[in-house]
Regions:
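Extracytoplasmic "Venus flytrap"
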Residues: 37-57, 79-86, 108-109, 185-194, ...
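Hydrophobic alpha-helical
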Residues: 110-122, 199, 228, 233-256, ...
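Segments of small-molecule ligand-sensing domains
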Residues: 310-320, 331-398, 420
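Extracytoplasmic ligand/sensor domains, especially the bilobed periplasmic-binding protein
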Residues: 101-212, 261-284
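Immediate post-signal peptide segment of exported/extracytoplasmic ligand-binding proteins
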Residues: 28-40, 68-73, 172-180
Length: 420
């Protein structure tokens, strides 16, 4: 298979006019017709990473079909960082210095996004991550706002992901299935450290005693010993934090007939290809996600899913929803700035974001909030959903207002009888 150079451009939107001036050089609006260049850094070999670049292309095409931003087309400059922090940084640097992007959308991997963040500060480049979850991304902005203010967190922080899973666990696992205990099983990665810290705090409050806490190497290939250890502690459910891995633990969970529900965050399970990837072993798996096919979180959700499926043949991963919204949010910020792409004015406009996208209502936390420039979490904003794989399809099982199915488990999973 042909291997591209780490920072190689994969494709871009056809645009007209000359390339706009370098970011930070011109504080005013560019000439009408000049393209607005947005860099998109993804991971093409990963399910979530490929969804970033694909969704961005759909959003840009839609915006351009409607006349662009006050007559100026969006031009995407797309890179593949191959899930490497160093390659991600090189792509980020090239986006600013050579390709003259006005903003960067980049990476679902926390280690990669955290490596890019200092360059966002140094280059004064507006940067929004559509999938990385580490609390440290927004914590850096909070702790040194003037330096890091160019970074925005376009996905839920690890703390909010954990809280969403705890809210689901309380409403469904505890209240309906009367479960009382759980084992945490997370990959050892930057995003899961704060995730697990929050799990240890909020799962007991949700009604689930934590009887085991396992952090495993993402390179693990045999999960049998891990599942054996968990079973020996007799929890009612497994709460996961997995993204870099997904297929192998799911396949072994089914093959080993582990009699415990698999819930939590399984990022790879958020895409519709996961059924095929696991040969159906994902039946019954529950994961937090941004949305699910057929679930109208807002009037924009299903039209986007349909457009994505029509173009690419499968549904987007969670990063697809966020990236699609982010392209629109950047375009909206430039429009509200009367066309200016000055980085400080971009920051001001992004801070004033109030946008209803595919995932819900977007606003960012302020300078004095704990998670500065992170997505606001909670009712009326973005909470995510929990979906379950049932009969080869993803269905929404939480929250109640969006659910289109009730939780059911494979026959090998032993759970108490649910009550409505």
């Amino acid at each position: 298979m042909y291997k591209r150079k780490p920072w190689q451009i994969l494709h871009s939107v056809v645009t007209v006019g000359a390339v706009a001036g370098a970011l930070g050089v011109s504080a005013g609006a560019q000439a009408a017709g000049d393209p607005i260049k947005i860099a998109v850094i993804g991971e093409e070999s990963a399910i979530a990473g490929a969804s970033i670049t694909r969704a961005a292309q759909i959003a840009a095409d839609e915006i351009n079909a409607k006349g662009g931003v006050d007559g100026r087309p969006i031009q995407l400059v797309i890179y593949d960082d191959h899930s490497s922090a160093s390659e991600g940084v090189r792509a980020f640097q090239r986006a600013a210095s050579e390709d003259k992007a006005v903003a960067v959308i980049g990476s679902y991997i926390s280690e990669v996004a955290l490596a890019m963040e200092p360059w966002s500060a140094r280059l004064k480049m507006p940067f929004i991550t559509p999938g990385a979850a580490s609390n440290d991304i927004s914590k850096h902005v909070h702790d040194d706002y003037d330096h890091y203010k160019y970074t925005f967190h376009g996905w839920m922080t690890s703390a909010f992901i954990a809280q969403s899973i705890c809210d689901f666990s309380h409403d469904i696992l505890v209240d309906q299935f009367h479960m009382k205990s759980t084992a945490i099983m997370s990959e050892d990665a930057a995003w899961t450290k704060p995730l697990d810290e929050k799990f240890l705090e909020c799962l007991p409050k949700a009604g689930l005693k934590v009887v085991d806490h396992i952090r495993f190497n993402p390179d693990t290939t045999d999960f049998t010993p891990i599942f054996n250890e968990i079973e020996s502690k007799h929890p009612d459910v497994i709460t996961t934090g997995i993204s870099h891995v997904g297929v192998q633990p799911t396949v072994q969970w089914q093959a080993q007939q582990v009699p415990l529900p698999l819930t939590g965050q399984s990022s790879q399970a958020t895409t519709s290809t996961f059924w095929k990837d696991t040969n159906g072993a994902t039946e019954g798996v529950i994961t937090a996600s941004a949305a699910a096919p057929g679930v109208a979180i807002t009037p924009k959700t299903i039209p986007f899913i349909n457009a994505y499926e029509k173009r690419y043949g499968d549904a987007p991963a969670y990063t697809g929803y966020s990236t699609y919204d982010i392209v629109y949010i950047i375009a909206d910020a430039i429009r509200r700035n009367n066309g200016s792409t000055d980085p400080d004015k971009m920051v001001d406009a992004l801070e004033k974001t109030d946008y209803v996208g595919t995932m819900g209502r977007w606003e960012f936390y302020g300078r004095n909030d704990q998670f500065t420039h992170a997505l606001k979490y909670g009712p009326g904003f973005i909470t995510g959903i929990n979906l379950q794989w049932q009969d080869g399809k993803q269905v929404a099982v939480w929250p109640k207002a969006l659910a289109n199915a009730k939780v059911k488990f494979p026959s090998f999973v032993k759970v108490p009888q649910a009550t409505n």
